[in-house]
């Protein structure tokens, strides 16, 4: 099929070449022979009047023109796939759809687990692939390489739709034998003490780190770990402190002795956990179904949070108010 002189099959070839960066792998990914893919490159070069790719050993290196074309080509193919090719009535009970989701271990434990349990009942063949945090989640959304981002709203792109899940706040946690933590935690105390901190990606700050930077503050991180769930192990028997979402602190306090203390305000206001999806997925029936489940299960999490302050007072570690 041609559109204004361009064979649209060539866009599929261009997308494969940009993704694989190797001729043989790109040809294999779209079921072409290597000679056919070489011919496609020649035709692409002729149409766009650009070399598009140069060879560096066996790797294809895109030119600036190819780099500029790639996002629009990927988005166009994604729209065609979702709006025309895969547009079928969605039957959860019969679907074998797989959803790729980026989220923290906190949201996995406190939110997604309940989602997965429900989906197992309603759509037993639907599966999930949980991905680690990326420093470029916007790029993954744009390419359609991920179905959902679940993360604090402050870190979300403004170019893709989103929906609020629930609000959360931070508390300070420590070993009950911590000798350095004062009864009333000031911001000076907080930044001067040794911290165990979660890191997500090489460049993206955690929420608490972002909030501190907003006030021109910096804490002393003694142990950095790739997620919240490892934090309690590095508090035990030490005078370190850590900053955790309240729900997660309550979850840990059921099994691990923890001292839970309120953080100094207004440095650490409540924040919003939200879900975001690629704009082309907005009308995809499977995505719509999954988003509805997210929102329904999030409303149940929110309901439970109404009693969190009362529950916190009964936790293994007592909350202390500054």
Swiss-Prot record:
Annotated ranges, domain HTH lysR-type: 6-63
InterPro entries: LysR-type_TF, LysR_subst-bd, NodD_PBP2, Tscrpt_reg_HTH_LysR, WH-like_DNA-bd_sf, WH_DNA-bd_sf
PROSITE patterns xrefs: HTH_LYSR
Keyword Hydrolase among record annotations: no
CDD domains reported for this sequence: PBP2_NodD
One Gene Ontology term of the molecular function aspect: DNA binding
Keyword list, A-Z: Activator, DNA-binding, Nodulation, Plasmid, Repressor, Transcription, Transcription regulation
DNA-binding region(s), residue ranges: 23-42
Cited SUPFAM superfamilies: Periplasmic binding protein-like II, Winged helix' DNA-binding domain
Similarity comment text for this entry: Belongs to the LysR transcriptional regulatory family.
Known function: Regulates the expression of the nod abcFE genes which encode other nodulation proteins. NodD is also a negative regulator of its own expression. Binds flavonoids as inducers.
Record's protein name: Nodulation protein D 1
Organism: Sinorhizobium fredii (strain NBRC 101917 / NGR234)
Gene: nodD1
